[in-house]
Amino acid sequence: KLEPFTAFRNYHSVGKVGRIHQDVNSIENGVSYQMYRDFDSLHMQVSKEAHFMPTFEWNYDNEYLRELDRGYDFKEDLLTPGYFSMLMHPGEEIVFSAGTSELVPSQLQSLFASELKNRKKITDFESALDIAAEQFISETKKGTEITAGFHWFGRWGRDTFISLPGLTLSRKQPHVCKSVMNTMLQDLRDGLLTNVGAGEEARYNSADASLWFFWSLQKYAAHTKNTKGLWVEFGDRIKEIVESYRKGTWYNIHMTEDGLLWGGQEDVALTWMDAMV
C-alpha cells in the first residue's frame, strides 16, 4: 500500500484544508489529479500494475520544525487523494514517480537506475562544491538560467552575474557561462537587465545588473582568451548598455557630468538587498 501526501501550493506558503476537485483520471499504472482548477495535473505512477483507491482524506497539522525555528507558519494540511495497492514479493523493488507529465511505467526502473548512476558522489570538499554548483544551473524554456536560492528564489539578474564565473568558469564550463549570458540578454531593455523574472513578468529595478554582466563578461574573456570573438558576439549589446547608461534610462539611472553613475526613484529599490538610497 502506497499513500502519497500532496500539498499543491507555492513554495512560499503552506497548504490548508479547502475546496478541492474530487476526481482522478486513470493513466497507465497510475492516476493524474488536479487539486485546483488553475494548477497543473499531478501524474502519479508506479512501475508495476496497481489499483488506485480514491479517498481524498486530509492529514492535519503536519509540522515543519525549520519553519518553526524561523518564526514562520509551520503547520500544513496535506491531502491524500488515495492510495495504490499492489502485490509485492520479498526483495522486489517498486519505483514510484510523481510529476507534471505522464511517463511510461515500463521505463521507470531504468530511469531510476540511470539517475542513480549519473549522480556524482561526494568524495571531498571540492566535489561537494562542484555538486552544489551544478544544482543552481537549470535549463528552462528561455534557456540556461541560474537559481538565486533554494527554495525561495527563482532567477535574479544581479545574483546570476555575481555567481556566474564561480559556477561555470571555475568548473571549466565556459559554454554554460556563455549560454547563461545569452539567456539573460534576451530580456535586455533600454540598457537594463532584469532584476527578477523574465519576459512579460520581468522587473527591471536594478541599477547594477547590467554592470555585473560586464564583470562576468570580463571573466569570460580572460578565461577563453577570445576577445575578438567576444566583441563580435556581444559588442552590440555592450554598446547598447553603455549608451543607455550615458544618456539615461529607467528609474533616473544616468551618467553625471563627472562621469559617475547616478540613479534613484522614490519608493523603488535599485540596489542590493532592496535598499532604497
Language-model-derived ranges and their functions:
Residues 1-277:
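Acidic, mature catalytic/reactive cores of soluble proteins
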